[in-house]
A protein has these predicted regions:
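GIY-YIG nuclease catalytic motif and its immediate N-terminal context
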Residues: 1-105
Length: 105
């Protein structure tokens, strides 16, 4: 299956999270069960391979690292999982303009 990366460069972080939920009807149920991991990266294919993500729910390019980091913060506030991190994110760099979400096995 080819990875589809949506262009969300003209959306705010809140709009991107809303769009993610709108595109995936079963996402709310998965979030309630802590089964959706969300992250930010500069190389989306490498990161998804590293996570061994099987069911990719959302991939998008944002306008900037700042927007991508804000998407992660908003998603976490809405119940998405970011792993064993307590500070609200796994860190980003200036190339981290992609956001992704996948179903946790």
């Amino acid at each position: 299956m080819e990875l589809v990366i949506l262009d969300c460069h003209d959306l705010t972080a809140e709009q991107i999270v809303d769009y993610m939920i709108e595109l995936n009807p079963d996402l709310r149920s998965l979030i309630k069960r802590q089964k959706v991991y969300v992250g930010v990266t500069g190389n989306i294919e490498e990161r998804l391979n590293r996570h061994n993500a099987k069911r990719i729910l959302f991939c998008a390019r944002t306008a900037s690292q700042r927007v991508a980091a804000e998407v992660e913060r908003v998603a976490v506030a809405r119940g998405f999982n970011i792993g064993k991190v307590t500070h609200g994110g796994n860190g980003t760099n200036s190339h981290s303009i992609y956001v992704y979400a996948y179903e946790i096995d």
